[in-house]
């Protein structure tokens, strides 16, 4: 598999993971707040980190495409 294909696959994987964390955060807001407020910091941090990892993967792909 070429480097570009690997990077594209990584971007898709990271996007899926970020979306999954975002969905968990959404579910918390829709279904368990305000009672589940103590879950908020952990879910927010995990979502933030997953989005950062996705962004890094996108940047790596763009750099490789140049």
Explain the meaning of each model-derived region:
Residues 24-65:
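Short, charge-rich amphipathic interface segments used for partner binding and complex assembly
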Residues 1-15:
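Short, charge/polar-rich alpha-helical segments
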């Amino acid at each position: 598999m070429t480097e570009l294909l690997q990077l594209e696959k990584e971007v898709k994987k990271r996007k899926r993971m970020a979306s999954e964390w975002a969905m968990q955060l959404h579910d918390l807001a829709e279904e368990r707040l305000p009672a589940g407020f103590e879950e908020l910091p952990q879910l927010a941090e995990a979502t933030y980190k997953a989005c950062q990892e996705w962004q890094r993967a996108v940047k790596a792909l763009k750099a490789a495409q140049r």
